[in-house]
Amino acid sequence: MTTLHRSAVAALLVGFAATALSAQSTFEQVDPMIGTGGEGHTFPGAVAPFGMVQFSPDTDTGCILRACYGHAAGYRYDDPTIQGFSLTHFSGAGHSDLGDFLMMPIAGNDVPLEPGDAGKPGSGYRSRYDHAAETARPGYYSVVLQDHGVRAELTAGTRVGMARYRAASSTQPMHLILDLRSSLYNYPGKILWSSIRLRPDGTVTGCRQTRGWAPDRTLCFALRFSVPLRGHAFVSTETDVAYKGFQGPGRGSDAVAERAGRALVARFDFGAVDRPIEVRSAISSVDEAGAIANLASEPGDFDAIRAKTMAAWRAALDVLKIEAPAPMQTSVATALYHALLAPAVAGDVDGRYRGPDNQVHHAQGYTFRSTFSLWDTFRAEHPLLTIVQPPSTSSDIVRSLVASRQHSPDGILPVWQFQGRETWTMIGYHAAPVIADAYLKGIRGFDADAALAAMVASATYAPYGGLGDYMKRGYVPIDREPEAASKTVEYAYDDWTIARMARAMGRTDIAARFGQRAGNWRNSFDARTGFIRARKTDGTFRVPFDPTAINYGSDYTEGNAWQYGWFVPQDQAALVRALGGDAATIAKLDAMFEFDNSKLDYSHAEDIAGLIGQYIHGNEPSHHVAYLYSYAGAPWRTQARLKQIVESQYHPTPDGLSGNDDLGQMSAWLVFTALGFYPVTPASLEYVIGRPFVNRAMLALPNGRRLTIIADRLDDGHPYVGTVMLNGRPVTRAYLRHDEIMAGGELRFTMQSMPNTAWAAGRADRPYSASMVRTPAKPVKRELAKRLG
């Protein structure tokens, strides 16, 4: 067959596949309830793609710290009551904050100002509800509040939240509670100060300063109502106030135009109305003027905002069309939805935002984003965005990261940041792989020199996480810094990504320096035990050593030696050699998955979930491990393990995620894996081939091309890959290059009942490792980047 003929046939096949999938809307398959139970920590409420406002119900805000873990997203599926609806939430985080500006509608004459007890109906403004009267769709949420006789509907634009409240009886007076005392992880003393004012035009504005996960966080709000106010009260419930000053007009009255304090709750009275009440809301981390501007940035009533946001979700989600059994279709569609919630817009419509220095800055020519859970999301979430979103999304992310470094009091890139404020959560300088991966894929629109300088600054900031010792010794010593084993290997990977970007930019001096540091993982590898271990300042490994032990602040970060023993993504081939070769590596991988945990107790470790032996899918350090068989010449074993993981860890139910979704990382893992490939090493420009879990998929790439993925004979009886074809040509290696994905066409898997042990088993067929002779995939040049989008 001639090349021209082969290309024409491939194009025709792609056209047929696209036609077959065109009727399948991914938007219609999404179920935002997935992950709202169990350990998923997702929320069901209304949000636009990457929206600043996440308008969602909170079922319990009174719990504190560790007791609050299950309510990190505000909502928990098995809770019997809803306390109210607040404007800010994390999706899938393992810690929490937010839950700002909680509102609750009430119909009737009794208007309590306290939330009450969930176990005592009628004791406060919280209300019982029934899941049968609850609806969650992308950009829309509704529920009937049984105790108040009110149907509440929520929708949201990028910077606007819209609520519509309808009383069961038009003769009942309607009220709205706004509780500025409420927050997620709402321990005593969290609310430092709050204010509220009723402006002459009827707009309600205010600000709140909190001390929570992010210290000294300021957030302002603005509200407008679709019906006139009949009355209001701004109440302070603060006790033991040492000095009250002088009362203003209406001494002692709560019907004042403004109030400030540490414990404020507001009541708005509308009287009996014969139509639904719509409440428009917006937030700003800058000031009240910013919130008011955001309030006006998206005109229209509830239905108009809902229609606009649903259209945005259709466009964002329908870049991927899938054909699969219904449970898998729902799981993958919802995974893509969850992957498009963060990093969230954090700048006002005029470009202003609050940075890590707590000062106001201006984003010119881009949208400032925040909510960076980088320890989680560098792995698959950010690589996924490069193939399902326009390049401007990743460009905005990089510009936001670099701007944050420029405004950081410490002069480094974000670690775990939200609303521009740093939390210092987790380890590593994982903004580096995010930036390097984007740059090497040809994404531009940012200052590459400033980005590289920011990466180097973060990797050489001695006070951070033992970096001073790391630069001096080549490892982080455990007797000077906790979680030293994890930090050593994660720093080494981040160093490799800096070297990769520097080399692509012609900065050979930086490339050589950080390329050498990329080998520092060897300093924590114990050849005797075959594990990554923590060393002391005297060079000895810390004892006693138990590879199954998990304790916070110990040698490892949210894991143990079994999980961290595999974290050398920049040079897995070298790790295979260090472990004794292919057979020894395969045996050790099998031992990990088949480990007997019956005598172990991890109940004290809240992030340890989704165990398959010592493989822990509910937390990120294990996410690449199933793909490592391919580095030892056994891709068929990767295929078997992936089937085991997907079938046990993902279900289309509220408790369908085995662990925290972590701002889209758990979900991005499933999207990639379902399509048949995964970015084990971001910034390598390669994806390791696994096996598909969908019969067909059509991916509309950001450059205008389409990649159609077909899995022939895919069913439970055919779990193994027999052959792989890309645009009619056999793929006999265990990886795909990024440029091959972006070129589009047809990727066809033929599945079979028995393993094809010969496929991609040769050493030359293995994915990239730094110590390999094979040349890595070349970075996408600027000219090609323009053509590829």
Predicted feature residues:
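Bacterial N-terminal signal peptides that target proteins for export
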Residues: 1-10
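Bacterial N-terminal signal peptides
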Residues: 10-19
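Accessory carbohydrate-recognition regions in carbohydrate-active enzymes
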Residues: 24-433, 439-489, 497, 502-523, ...
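Extracellular attachment/recognition segments
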Residues: 720
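Long, low-complexity, intrinsically disordered segments
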Residues: 781-789
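ATP-dependent phospho-/nucleotidyl transfer catalytic cores
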Residues: 494
